[in-house]
């Protein structure tokens, strides 16, 4: 494998071409009248989606230089998606426009460092202006409006998500699952809880696309101990492996030989297993493990105080649940199947008594957190349809809408449809620049701020964007938007065309930051396959398998 250094105009041209391809593929999904994109798979039917992040992630150009550029963009999109779960389409539209305008300025001989200074100065002013526009989300109707917009105008999705928030509260746990039925969307409230601990190794992941561990009908082993060696849990691991069901281990920690053995057996396929740290610290950890035991029907939380040893545990003494979902940061236990509601209610009453008798505000707060986790439950959005393709496309929109709803509840909302970004233009009019090239950078952001609303209007089949923008900018009502569903101007909040501030803010921030990286990028070193590599690969004849690696 040889490598090549690409610089100058060749690099600039490649960046422009890749960004244009990505924006063309992703931008068509923007707005309620945006179109879908089909992503081919190595097996099965193509996936149909309007999820901008999925589209960006799937684009892998054959050319090594184009692939390197696409990977930089995909990494930024991934960070944007991790932060807020939505906004990658807006981010790609903004990035493409900034890079297009910067290329023109570079070709005219402008100082790129000064342009970058102007771009970053304008970015901070725009972010401050967005914060001043926000309005808090208070009502169920407003929550439904936000979810509807993010679901590309699907009111049923908006109403169901608002119903979930009403069921479990604004801080409650809401998950999305595929249903085997034909009903498009249904809501099910079940027992369960979520805590802030993720998987201890990424090798436990079962869904590599979303980096999740997803288990159905798992056993749950609870212990206050730290697991360093595999021997104490070997008997129960063998029993679980024979049962064919997954296992979740919740312990103070799992490390060393114990962790490596669990990972190895997961990779070999001998056991579907995952391990997470127990939530909390000290006595609170003990209490929360007790809560999980009550919820899942586990007979014991193994500790030094308990007479029973881990080696003597039976399957009947482990906890169970309908589903478990683990990310790198959180664990969600859904619908414990064997727990007694009487036991849960008794535990809830016990915590309420502790709250009443506690004299410490801090202790009361922690007890209330435990109470909320036990009593709040989990709302499950079940997505159905007549085909797998339809279900997956709808599930993408439901997940985007759910992320947007959480963002709106957290930071509030701003006028939607690209209007909020457009209205920040006014703050850039009075922004002082040090020189002409820095002013060029500010002007680039001015043009970029118009790109999202232009794309949304274009996707609706209209070429009237310049007139719409001119009308919005000449009047003083910053709640006025253009509704592409009705093709009329309307108030953002009464018509429900609103966006979560957090989504708009992060999409803009990431877009400008990514464009700034490309502005001063002077060279890329890319690997290119040589003829020798091709010959060596042909003569190697493959590595063969590694033989049968037994279980424990």
From Swiss-Prot:
A GO CC annotation recorded here is:
cytoplasm
List the Pfam families.
Answer: Cpn60_TCP1
Enzyme Commission designation = 5.6.1.7
Q: What processes in GO biological process is this protein linked to? A: protein refolding
Q: Tell me what reaction this enzyme catalyses.
A: ATP + H2O + a folded polypeptide = ADP + phosphate + an unfolded polypeptide
List UniProt keywords, sorted A-Z. Answer: ATP-binding, Chaperone, Cytoplasm, Isomerase, Nucleotide-binding
**Superkingdom of origin:** Bacteria
CDD domains linked to this entry = GroEL (cd03344)
> Where located?
Cytoplasm
Please list the residues that bind ATP: 29-32, 50, 86-90, 417, 499
Gene Ontology MF terms in the entry = ATP binding; ATP-dependent protein folding chaperone; isomerase activity; unfolded protein binding
Give the similarity note.
Answer: Belongs to the chaperonin (HSP60) family.
The UniProt function text for this chain reads: Together with its co-chaperonin GroES, plays an essential role in assisting protein folding. The GroEL-GroES system forms a nano-cage that allows encapsulation of the non-native substrate proteins and provides a physical environment optimized to promote and accelerate protein folding.
Protein name listed in UniProt:
Chaperonin GroEL
The source organism is Ehrlichia canis (strain Jake)
């Amino acid at each position: 494998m040889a490598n090549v250094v690409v610089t100058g105009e060749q690099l600039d041209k490649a960046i422009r071409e890749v960004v244009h391809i990505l924006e063309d593929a992703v931008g068509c999904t923007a707005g309620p009248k945006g179109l879908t994109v089909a992503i081919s798979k190595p097996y099965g039917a193509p996936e149909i989606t309007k999820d901008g992040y999925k589209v960006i992630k799937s684009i892998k150009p054959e050319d090594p230089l184009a692939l390197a550029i696409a990977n930089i963009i995909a990494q930024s999109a991934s960070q944007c998606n991790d932060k807020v779960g939505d906004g990658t389409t807006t981010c790609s539209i903004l990035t493409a426009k900034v890079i297009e305008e910067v290329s023109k300025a570079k070709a005219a001989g402008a100082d790129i460092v000064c342009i970058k200074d102007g771009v970053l100065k304008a970015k901070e002013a725009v972010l401050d202006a967005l914060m001043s526009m926000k309005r808090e989300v208070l009502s169920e109707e407003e929550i439904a409006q936000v979810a509807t917009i993010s679901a590309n105008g699907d009111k049923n999705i908006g109403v169901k998500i608002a119903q979930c928030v009403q069921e479990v509260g604004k801080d409650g746990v809401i998950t999305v699952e595929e249903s085997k039925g034909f009903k498009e969307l249904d809501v099910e409230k079940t027992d369960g809880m979520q805590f802030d601990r993720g998987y201890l190794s990424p090798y436990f992941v079962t869904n590599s696309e979303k980096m999740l561990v997803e288990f159905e009908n798992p056993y749950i082993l609870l212990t206050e101990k730290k697991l360093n060696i595999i021997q104490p849990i070997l008997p129960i691991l063998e029993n679980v492996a024979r049962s064919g069901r997954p296992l979740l281990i919740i312990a103070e920690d799992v490390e060393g030989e114990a962790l490596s053995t669990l990972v190895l057996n997961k990779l070999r396929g001998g056991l579907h297993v995952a391990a997470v740290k127990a939530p909390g610290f000290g006595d609170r950890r003990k209490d929360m493990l007790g809560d999980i035991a009550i919820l899942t029907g586990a007979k014991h939380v193994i500790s030094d105080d308990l007479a029973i040893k881990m080696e003597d545990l039976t399957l009947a003494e482990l906890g169970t649940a309908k589903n478990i979902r683990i990310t790198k940061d959180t664990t969600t236990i859904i619908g414990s199947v064997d727990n007694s509601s009487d036991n849960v209610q008794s535990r809830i009453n016990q915590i309420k008594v502790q709250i009443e008798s506690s004299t410490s505000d801090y202790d009361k707060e922690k007890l209330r957190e435990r109470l909320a986790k036990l009593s709040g439950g989990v709302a499950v959005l079940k997505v159905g349809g007549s085909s797998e393709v339809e279900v997956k496309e709808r599930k993408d929109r439901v997940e985007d809408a759910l992320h947007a709803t959480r963002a709106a509840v957290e930071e509030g909302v701003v006028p939607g449809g690209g209007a909020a970004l457009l209205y920040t233009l006014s703050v850039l009019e009075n922004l002082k620049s040090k020189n002409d090239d820095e002013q060029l950078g500010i002007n680039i952001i001015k043009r970029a701020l118009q790109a999202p609303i232009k794309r949304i209007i274009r996707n609706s089949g209209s070429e009237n964007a310049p007139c719409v923008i001119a009308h919005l900018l000449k009047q003083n009502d910053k709640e006025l938007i253009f509704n592409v569903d009705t093709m009329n101007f309307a108030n953002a909040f009464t018509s429900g065309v609103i966006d979560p501030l957090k989504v708009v803010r992060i999409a803009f921030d990431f877009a400008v930051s990514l464009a700034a990286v490309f502005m001063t990028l002077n060279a890329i070193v890319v690997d290119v396959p040589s003829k020798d590599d091709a010959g060596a690969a042909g003569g190697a004849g493959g590595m063969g398998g590694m033989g049968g690696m037994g279980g424990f």
